[in-house]
């Protein structure tokens, strides 16, 4: 974190610098003009994590500033949502005078939503007992007069949910509202308004699609649920069980009837498609019945592994969302031999950092 860089007056210049850097880095692929999707310059992050400092009777949040090489007190935090900032103040006021709730508390995590829900996780260097639970229940009751809040307590090999360990986000995407279960301690897009722009862009570039869609690394179904409207059927894979469970929940609450989630890794799915291995998890699913002309990938920072990249290259159209331009560039070295980049986007998920989220649509060269 570099707090000095978080200056809304410099936001536009910082975003333009990212665009230029991206354009230069991908010039060899003859990309079209970059479509740039800006963030709000402040209060854009829907989640935030803070360490907690104890100093006599005082108690406050802090972060480590790499530029200063020191901890920085954070009574408020410009990138965090307005809801998180409001909760930060209300929560610390309740924790300070409470010996049970503050004892060996070392971290607080916040997960907020545009829909108004917020989840607070309190992390401790001690085991949590019945007294802690009673005090946490009272804390939740008091905060609930102002917030739609749930509280979780965590310690080594211990997790206490007072009610539930998730929030439900609602995103207005074009003329539809999609609802997403977001689980504590699982991956979610941190910048909800930019996430909406990403979904709208993905829907736009896949309009008038033929056949079915295959998605790898689908997470909680964020993209596949929104894209289902553009395809006859969608087949999606995800390895993490909490994400698969959330995806199934999201499919149901959004009334999606043409989306099938399979719990397996991209590498395992590549083997299944190549008929190298059989999997019990695929019983009852006829892979050969899917006519997938389009594949959607949103891989981790490491990019796509070689075997999966070979699989991806076999599709007519490839929609690739990347959180790491370096590994995207590496993957394009192979994909560019058979496909042309026809759409290219920069999504500023993380203002005031070097991080760039990108999207490319590749279409097979005729």
From Swiss-Prot:
Highest taxon of source: Bacteria
Catalysed conversion reaction = uridine(54) in tRNA + S-adenosyl-L-methionine = 5-methyluridine(54) in tRNA + S-adenosyl-L-homocysteine + H(+); uridine(341) in tmRNA + S-adenosyl-L-methionine = 5-methyluridine(341) in tmRNA + S-adenosyl-L-homocysteine + H(+)
- Matching SUPFAM superfamilies, A to Z? S-adenosyl-L-methionine-dependent methyltransferases
Signal peptide (from-to): none
Residues engaged in binding S-adenosyl-L-methionine? 189, 217, 222, 238, 298
Q: What class of enzyme is it?
A: transferase
The catalytic residues are 323, 357
Under the heading InterPro entries, the entry gives:
MeTrfase_TrmA_AS, MeTrfase_TrmA_CS, SAM-dependent_MTases_sf, TrmA_MeTrfase, U5_MeTrfase_fam
Q: Which GO terms describe its molecular function?
A: rRNA binding; tRNA (uracil(54)-C5)-methyltransferase activity, S-adenosyl methionine-dependent; tRNA binding
This entry carries the following GO cellular component terms, namely: cytosol
EC assignment: the record states 2.1.1.-, 2.1.1.35
Tell me which PROSITE patterns the record gives.
Answer: SAM_MT_RNA_M5U, TRMA_1, TRMA_2
One Pfam match, given by its short name, reads tRNA_U5-meth_tr
Entry keyword annotation includes Methyltransferase: yes
Note whether Lyase occurs among the keywords: no
Q: Name one GO biological process term.
A: tRNA methylation
Give the record's family classification: Belongs to the class I-like SAM-binding methyltransferase superfamily. RNA M5U methyltransferase family. TrmA subfamily.
The task this protein performs is described as: Dual-specificity methyltransferase that catalyzes the formation of 5-methyluridine at position 54 (m5U54) in all tRNAs, and that of position 341 (m5U341) in tmRNA (transfer-mRNA).
Name by which UniProt lists this protein = tRNA/tmRNA (uracil-C(5))-methyltransferase
- Name its species: Shewanella oneidensis (strain ATCC 700550 / JCM 31522 / CIP 106686 / LMG 19005 / NCIMB 14063 / MR-1)
Upper taxonomic lineage: Bacteria, Pseudomonadati, Pseudomonadota, Gammaproteobacteria, Alteromonadales
Record gene name: trmA
């Amino acid at each position: 974190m570099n707090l000095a860089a978080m200056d809304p007056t410099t936001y536009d210049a910082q975003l333009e610098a990212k665009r230029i850097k991206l354009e230069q880095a991908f010039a060899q692929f003859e990309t079209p003009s970059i479509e740039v999707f800006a963030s709000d310059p402040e209060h854009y992050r829907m989640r935030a994590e803070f360490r907690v400092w104890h100093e006599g009777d005082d108690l406050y949040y802090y972060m480590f500033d790499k530029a200063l090489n020191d901890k920085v007190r954070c009574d408020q935090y410009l990138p965090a949502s307005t809801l998180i900032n409001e909760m930060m103040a209300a929560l610390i006021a309740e924790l300070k005078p409470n010996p049970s709730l503050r004892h060996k508390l070392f971290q607080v995590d916040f997960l907020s939503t545009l829909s108004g829900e917020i989840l607070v996780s309190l992390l401790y260097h001690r085991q949590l007992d019945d007294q802690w639970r009673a005090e946490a229940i009272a804390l939740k009751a008091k905060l609930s007069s102002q917030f739609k809040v749930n509280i979780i307590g965590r310690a080594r090999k211990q997790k206490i949910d007072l009610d539930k360990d998730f929030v439900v986000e609602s995103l207005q995407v074009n003329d539809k509202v999609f609802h997403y279960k977001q689980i504590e301690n699982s991956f979610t897009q941190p910048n909800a308004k930019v996430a909406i722009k990403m979904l709208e862009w993905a829907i736009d570039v896949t309009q008038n699609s033929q056949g079915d869609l295959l998605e790898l690394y689908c997470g909680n179904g964020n993209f596949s649920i929104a894209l289902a409207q553009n395809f006859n059927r969608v087949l999606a894979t995800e390895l993490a069980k909490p994400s698969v469970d959330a995806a199934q929940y999201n499919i149901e609450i959004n009334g999606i009837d043409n989306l099938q989630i399979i719990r397996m890794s991209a590498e395992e799915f590549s083997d299944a498609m190549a008929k190298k291995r059989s999997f019990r998890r695929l019983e009852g699913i006829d892979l050969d019945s899917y006519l997938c002309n389009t594949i959607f990938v949103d891989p981790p920072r490491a990019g796509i592994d070689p075997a999966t990249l070979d699989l991806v290259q076999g599709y007519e159209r490839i929609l690739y969302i990347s959180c790491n331009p370096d590994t995207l560039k590496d993957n394009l070295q192979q994909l560019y031999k058979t496909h042309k980049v026809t759409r290219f986007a920069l999504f500023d998920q993380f203002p005031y950092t070097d991080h760039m989220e990108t999207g490319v649509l590749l279409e097979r060269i005729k």
